[in-house]
Amino acid sequence: MSVNSPVRPVMAADILARKGGEPLVCLTAYTTPMARLVDAHCDITLVGDSLGMVVHGLPTTLGVTMEMMILHGKAVARGTSRAMLVIDMPFGSYEESPAQAFANARRLMAETGCAAVKLEGGRHMAGTIRFLVERGIPVMAHVGLTPQAVNALGGYKVQGRGADADRVMEDAIAVAEAGAFSVVLEKVPDGLSQRITQRVAIPTIGIGASAHCDGQVLVLDDMLGLFTDFRPKFVKRYGELGTAADEAIAAYAAEVRARRFPASEHVFPDELKGKQP
């Protein structure tokens, strides 16, 4: 391969092959500049419907539309060359029927160039996952806390404690057997997450789950300290970009009001020194 050959992007088969190996690294991204940063370090870039909350200021993910996912999906695709690009299917775009799910998944892939879609739900979505996979659409599943079902679940609660553990385990087994290439475990207790990881043949990707999952995912704006409306227990802040941005904007505003910006090096003289071009 020559030095100028394009980098082969990560694909579903590559993710499957990582089961039980080095942990998979996944982050969300919503813009081209951030996608470039994520692409340099991660195996999977997820255009999550969390964009509704962290980018558009919505109270939940329920108001996210296909058009929003496509807009941000295109932007992230422009900044992604190596990582596997996965896009969330928004609420209402896949639950009605497998045919509806296929039509919208096909649209996401065709218009953004993503490599896979992600959808929420366990046993009740297994038939839809199988329908998509049989028609050439790789699917990342999502069980445990499924934010699109927040109203039915009674809030953003941990899923799978006590007698509820069997339900979450059965959901994970069902989506794996349906052909999903990986499954996100969200807000699932540590021990149960480990048992699911040992039980299913596909990689588990934890968010508020266990360090023993096959990979981890976080919302980029959470881990960078950009989204500060609330902070889930499972989020570790690896930066405080929100604070840094606030300080930078405050400094800019102060300099403008004091007429210290723009300074001489930021403006153009009336005449050029020396020979005219």
Curated annotation (Swiss-Prot):
Keywords, in A-Z order: Cytoplasm, Magnesium, Metal-binding, Pantothenate biosynthesis, Transferase
MF-aspect GO terms: 3-methyl-2-oxobutanoate hydroxymethyltransferase activity; magnesium ion binding
Catalytic residues (UniProt): E186 (proton acceptor)
Main location per the UniProt record: cytoplasm
UniProt EC number: 2.1.2.11
Taxonomic lineage from the root: Bacteria, Pseudomonadati, Pseudomonadota, Alphaproteobacteria, Rhodobacterales
Origin superkingdom: Bacteria
General function of this protein: Catalyzes the reversible reaction in which hydroxymethyl group from 5,10-methylenetetrahydrofolate is transferred onto alpha-ketoisovalerate to form ketopantoate.
Residues annotated to bind 3-methyl-2-oxobutanoate: D49, S50, D88, K118
Protein name: 3-methyl-2-oxobutanoate hydroxymethyltransferase
Name of the gene: panB
Cofactor(s) the protein requires to work: Mg(2+)
Assembly and interaction partners: Homodecamer; pentamer of dimers.
Annotated positions binding Mg(2+): D49, D88, E120
Regions annotated as coiled coil: none
GO cellular component, one term: cytoplasm
Any one GO BP annotation for this protein: pantothenate biosynthetic process
Family: Belongs to the PanB family.
Pfam family for this entry, one: Pantoate_transf
Reaction catalyzed: 3-methyl-2-oxobutanoate + (6R)-5,10-methylene-5,6,7,8-tetrahydrofolate + H2O = 2-dehydropantoate + (6S)-5,6,7,8-tetrahydrofolate
Pathway: Cofactor biosynthesis; (R)-pantothenate biosynthesis; (R)-pantoate from 3-methyl-2-oxobutanoate: step 1/2
